[in-house]
Amino acid sequence: MDKLIINGGRKLKGEVTVSGSKNASLPICIAAVLAPGASTITNVPRLRDITTTAKLLESLGATIERHENTMRIDAGTINTVEATYDLVKTMRASVLVLGPLLARFGRSRVSLPGGCAIGARPIDQHLKGLKALGAEIRLEHGYVEAIAKKGLKGARINFDVSTVGGTEHLMMAAAIAKGESILENAAREPEIADLADYLNRMGAKVEGAGTDTIRIQGVSELTPAAYEVMPDRIEAGTFMCAAAITGGDIKINGMKLEHLDALTFKLMDAGVEITNRNGVVRVKGPKRPQAVNIKTRPYPGFATDMQAQFMALMCVAEGASVISENIFENRFMHVSELLRFGADITVEGNSATVKGVKKLSGAPVMATDLRASACLVLAGLAAEGTTEIQRIYHLDRGYEQIETKLAGLGADIQRVSEP
């Protein structure tokens, strides 16, 4: 099992390029199921979750070809509508194949999902929406079986809560349903707009993605299309925090700063200098950041996927900050590991109070989930001494060669394989 060893205390300097978005790539690759024939998706990051998605699609009979950051998906060879537990258990997004298979073939059977162990994350909104589109849903023996003998029919669906996966799922299913579907209280994340752009490239009629009301005029069929995935805003935000926590000065290529307004404003409040010239974002960290409070919210609010990284920054800030997590329960699992660095953090309910310390000290720590692992990397970069991070397979689920990119910015970081 691999681990990371970091000798901290180095200011990051130089340029780095952001990879394609994991959270956009997953639903886009799954949406290829809707169109018989071969779609070519580019700017796909080389990550464990992407490999899992490719295996999932292959298990359905699709033909997959991968070369570096390009994936060719031929969904014309799909020969089964069942996604089994052994693949679905490792990644929550796998459940998104339920709707596209149902819409195209009239039936699907998918195991209940796994993935990061963050709170309940139920799929009730997904199933409620599919029922509204005319599906019969049965839950038995850990599987969801959906049947629509006469095909799906457009419907008005109002989500009880903002759900990114639910919005993506029903947008895909409604794309080839009969008639118009309206999704109300839809999630507004940029990845949803990216998926809609891909669906429209295939011939779908989706309007309003990126707002809280999405209209989908169903079409009889979709055709395969070529598409380039958007850049990963969470990776970009992680590099912004890395520059800030090390007092570094870096340039980030390939990111869209407008996708990170909430983070950008909070970083600037903390004393970080951020400029955007010709699509290149320069981030210059202060000698010591100022304490800033944050509350995670659905997009365009502060992203829950950036909460852990921002907490790492606040560990070395001047003053005390309060970090409130309003999206997922159990998303403070990184706190106990940050304490090993010498951080001063107390948790009460969904809020953590972070009293900044002048210096963190390197420590042996263990990653608990994807974004928590990134937070530990940031703490290790800022800490004096050596940090050893175990269980970095979590990190590999969402960051493409992050240690190589950080080393390119001057970090003393290496991956070590253990027997």
From Swiss-Prot:
GO terms for molecular function: UDP-N-acetylglucosamine 1-carboxyvinyltransferase activity. One of its GO terms (cellular component) is cytoplasm. Disulfide bonds: none annotated. InterPro entries: Enolpyruvate_Tfrase_dom (IPR001986), Enolpyruvate_Tfrase_sf (IPR036968), MurA_subfamily (IPR050068), RNA3'P_cycl/enolpyr_Trfase_a/b (IPR013792), UDP_GlcNAc_COvinyl_MurA (IPR005750). The modification 2-(S-cysteinyl)pyruvic acid O-phosphothioketal is found at C116. The keyword Cell division applies. The active site is at C116 (proton donor). It catalyses: phosphoenolpyruvate + UDP-N-acetyl-alpha-D-glucosamine = UDP-N-acetyl-3-O-(1-carboxyvinyl)-alpha-D-glucosamine + phosphate. One of its GO terms (biological process) is regulation of cell shape. It is found in: Cytoplasm. Its EC number is 2.5.1.7. Phosphoenolpyruvate binds at K22, N23. UDP-N-acetyl-alpha-D-glucosamine binds at R92, R121, P122, I123, D124, Q125, D305, I327. Pathway: Cell wall biogenesis; peptidoglycan biosynthesis. It holds the Pfam family EPSP_synthase. Keywords: Cell cycle, Cell division, Cell shape, Cell wall biogenesis/degradation, Cytoplasm, Peptidoglycan synthesis, Pyruvate, Transferase. It is an enzyme of class 2 (transferase). Belongs to the EPSP synthase family. MurA subfamily. Cell wall formation. Adds enolpyruvyl to UDP-N-acetylglucosamine. PANTHER family: UDP-N-ACETYLGLUCOSAMINE 1-CARBOXYVINYLTRANSFERASE. This is UDP-N-acetylglucosamine 1-carboxyvinyltransferase. It comes from Trichlorobacter lovleyi (strain ATCC BAA-1151 / DSM 17278 / SZ). The gene is murA.
